[in-house]
């Protein structure tokens, strides 16, 4: 009979102790020359953003917001800077630093341990965050099994600093496609860049396995130069993923591959460089996003500009530009994605916004692609993508006007993620 009162007393004392252990949340007021409100694309002049803990509490003119702040508020005055929400990259490969040279992809798989690649990923996650990208969708770790899950969890637990992550883990491709390039068929146990499947039940098992090990989304290869997975195989993947509340991204660059993926019900087309009008009309009708990944192509051609004059290269670039322009004209929702997969490209994620404006998007359209559109694709519009009360305090600031010159986003001077200042290159006021 004595046990029950003692348990009750212990429970009371434990509650009291936990209440005294709770630290008051830090309150910060960020002041700036102006705030870009989204999705409107209009500026709020003389902006103030009140932050409590990791969330935004109030947004308005600085003088009015200051009245709501407690006496011990910490003020961060960014002067005349322009504040935007933290940017979102919907197509990263943080676990991949593919070197130059022949068979480089295969060498990357066989010469680096999963642990080493996870550490590379942590370094590149930090570079991405410092560039102003506070959220990423990492669409396949390219042969490092589930190391991207570990990186995501380490970031969430504060062990390393990086953007919020959604991870696709291994990716799924048809047997005989997307195998390590240049590897002898005798090496049957060699690591592969994606999980290889054949048949609908094989696909179903792969999707369930990846979700079980922590995948936030599923990545399919609808084609690899030519169509690979069948409509039926992709439909099963979509069915299993959607049942588990996960979205499906499809690598697709050919008209047939895109058509098959959209027919199967995927949520986004990654790349889509060869999309024709029929593809884009289908995507618009079904609400499928386009993540065009333009800047990685520009980076490849920048190594040897003369290659642009090759007839095949010219045709490819023309098709890519036409696909983006038609997507915009038809009202297909475009989301930002850099496809950074080399050491020198991680942290240059803003190049994608510049590349989009070079293909016909306006600066505000490119910014929406990396904010509100991207947040919707991630199913996180209540968390990120705009500076509003209740959302995470993910902010960036730049000098100049990104609505006039989107290239200023290549030089982000202030980054805050979840109420924590990651970098501040503005002078103290």
Predicted region positions:
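Metal-associated gating/positioning segment near the N- to mid-region
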Residues: 78-159, 232, 256, 260-264
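Histidine-rich, glycine-flanked metal-binding segment
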Residues: 20-24, 35, 40-84, 107, ...
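Active-site gating loops and adjacent loop-to-helix segments of metal-dependent hydrolytic enzymes
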Residues: 95-116, 175-192, 285-317
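Divalent metal-dependent hydrolysis catalytic cores, especially in the metallo-beta-lactamase
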Residues: 120-146, 162-170, 213-226, 247, ...
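Bacterial N-terminal signal peptides
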Residues: 1-11
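Alpha-helix-loop-beta-strand connector modules within alpha/beta enzyme cores
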Residues: 153-171, 228-253, 287, 291-295
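Histidine/acidic-residue-rich catalytic or RNA/ligand-binding cores of hydrolases
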Residues: 99-101, 148, 228, 258-264, ...
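His/Asp/Glu-enriched, well-ordered alpha-helical/loop segment
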Residues: 107, 243, 316-402
